[in-house]
Amino acid sequence: MARDKRAVSGWLVLDKPYGMTSTQAVGKLRWLYSAEKAGHAGTLDPLATGLLPIALGEATKTVPFVQGGGKRYRFTLEWGSATATDDREGEVVARSDVRPSEAQLRAALPAFTGTIEQRPPAFSAIKVAGERASDLARAGETVALAPRPVTISELVLLRHTPESSDFEMACEKGTYVRALARDLAEALGTRGHVTALRRTAVAGFTEADAILLETLEASTDRDRLLRPVATALRHLPELRLGPEEAALLRNGNPVLLRGRDAPIEIADAWASCNGQVVAIGSVHAGHFRPSRVLRA
């Protein structure tokens, strides 16, 4: 028997377990909370564990503001073999006896920091003629995705042996760890693939914010584990308005901002009333214009 849906809203940072897809994780939380709506702020591969921010209810309207934030990963690269998926889930497609030294590896890392061109893995969610590249690849089609610019702000070697190395990486949206591992190995004259991957931070959330699925399932008061909708907007200017102005915004109307310090122009901001998010929008000519309105 289907559960009755309820108007629950907020953010939860799930510590996604190994083997679960991001879509499955969203479905699980939506069921646990009987939420009307749910969505995640950035796909995490089934192979990966770690931070997967999930929005419930009205928080789904704030997903883009988390999705675009920076991310941090720890991963293990195994030397000597390439796979079809660039991780340990795929079949081996090439081998090499070459093993880089630690000195060679450290010398290669600077070329993979900053803004670089990266070719996404064939097994990815990128759309090709309306279909996911991964679906085409599984169907046996050759998928050649064009390189695209990505930004890697930090790439640190944590441990090195002849057979595998551990790294920590900070990057921006659109960066594929699997592609980095593939390209780094090829630059060192060998082959490689990712055998372990963990997202440790995303858009200001850290591992201290993460909640295990087992903890969530066992909780008798799950709502207290939710973070406010405004959590996703904490990096944007907040405009505190009164009830009358909030009512105008909820009907989709702009409001004139009053007061000596009222802003004239802001690209992205959010309006609140009594601590609750009313709308997300921008300020032009001293008027706040809503682009997304949230239910009370």
Residue ranges and their predicted role:
Residues 1-40, 44, 48, 69, ...:
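Accessory RNA 3′-end/elbow-binding domains used by RNA modification enzymes
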Residues 37-67, 122, 135-138:
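Glycine/acidic-rich beta-strand-loop module
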Residues 54, 75, 130, 180, ...:
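Residue-level signal for inorganic ion chemistry
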Residues 59, 64-118:
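Acidic, low-complexity central loop/insert segments
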Residues 124, 128-147, 152:
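Extended alpha-helical targeting/anchoring segments
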Residues 125, 132, 137, 164-204:
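Pseudouridine synthase
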Residues 149-163:
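Helix-hairpin-helix/helix-loop-helix acidic hairpins
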